[in-house]
Amino acid sequence: MEKFVIEGKQRLTGRVKISGAKNAALPILAGALLTGGTVRLTEVPELTDIYTMLEVLKALGAKVTFSEGEVVLHTPEITSAEAPYEQVRKMRASFLVMGPLLARTGRARISLPGGCAIGARPIDLHLKGFEALGAKIEMGHGFIEATAPRLKGTTVYLDFPSVGATENIMMAAVLAEGQTIIENAAEEPEIVDLANFLNNMGAKIKGAGTKVIRITGVKDLDGVNHTVIPDRIEAGTFMIGAVATQGEVIVENVITDHLTPLIAKLIEAGAEVIEDEDQNALLVRSNGKLKPLDIKTLPYPGFPTDLQAQMMALLATVPGISVVTETVFENRFMHVTELNRMGAKIRIEGRSAFIEGVESLTGARVKATDLRAGAALVIAGLVADGVTEVGHIFHIDRGYERFEEKLRGLGAKIERVSD
């Protein structure tokens, strides 16, 4: 097991280039199964979750090469419609192959998914969508099987704007007969990126990024070249780190529109955020005179749940009382216990966390409970007095490419060591 050892009280200064978005790359990789042509993707981050997805695709018949951020995929035929348990148990997003498999072969069988243990995250929305398109769903011991000779377009209403369900149903519908309408669809930028990718292959999708997506089914899709959008959550993590450490960081390769709610909150707290449109970059700095905040996580375009933990690490040392309300996932305050071990004063009441700003945090031995909690503890370690050890950093490796290397480039004193 590896851990990060962090020496505190280090300002982050300099420039950092943001990687491609994991949450855009994963559904796009799954979507590559929809064509027998060659798919070439650039700006794919080198992360454990990406490698897991590539293993799933290989098991289904894809020929894959991956080097220096470029993936080339070719799946002339699907050799198996069953996603292997070994990979699926590691990562929930492997469930995204179900829509493409169903569309291309009429059958998909998959183990029940794993990944971060945050909340219920039910997959029933995906399954209801497939059923609406005409698939027959069978659930066995730890398995789900869907079969459909030919999917037929229909109207699907999502009870909750689930990102994964929107993506999976969209991919199933591109080869279905007739028109599919997804109502109360998720509006995340990663869905827009997936739709652009599919449309460039010959799909007919309109309305991605709005609450209603219309898909007209086509007979088949062609190969394509596509560049994955930048990772707004990685960008947000470095922006929050800059403010927390009273630093000055230029965050490069960002789409500012994707970061609107975070930028608004950082400015409200008293930080400075300046956009350089020509360079697709943001300058973020803070003199340390910050005000407490009220934050409520919401589906996009609201404040992202994936930045909630990092904001809490920042607010832990901001004078006054801040309130963070989590409405997207239950069980997403697991980092609070760890932050409190470092001297934070945070109490939880239902879905809200009340943060009483303390003068300083103290280095401690803590452990990442999930991906974003891990990033939050690293930020806390950079701010704290003394040395912090963050364990279970395999969680962090699932979503941040070369995290400690990028932080060292900004002046952080952080090392990866074997436990």
From Swiss-Prot:
The modification 2-(S-cysteinyl)pyruvic acid O-phosphothioketal is found at C116. Pathway: Cell wall biogenesis; peptidoglycan biosynthesis. Phosphoenolpyruvate binds at K22, N23. It is found in: Cytoplasm. GO terms for cellular component: cytoplasm. InterPro entries: Enolpyruvate_Tfrase_dom, Enolpyruvate_Tfrase_sf, MurA_subfamily, RNA3'P_cycl/enolpyr_Trfase_a/b, UDP_GlcNAc_COvinyl_MurA. It holds the Pfam family EPSP_synthase. It catalyses: phosphoenolpyruvate + UDP-N-acetyl-alpha-D-glucosamine = UDP-N-acetyl-3-O-(1-carboxyvinyl)-alpha-D-glucosamine + phosphate. GO terms for molecular function: UDP-N-acetylglucosamine 1-carboxyvinyltransferase activity. It is an enzyme of class 2 (transferase). UDP-N-acetyl-alpha-D-glucosamine binds at R92, R121, P122, I123, D124, L125, D306, V328. Cell wall formation. Adds enolpyruvyl to UDP-N-acetylglucosamine. Belongs to the EPSP synthase family. MurA subfamily. This is UDP-N-acetylglucosamine 1-carboxyvinyltransferase 2. It comes from Carboxydothermus hydrogenoformans (strain ATCC BAA-161 / DSM 6008 / Z-2901).
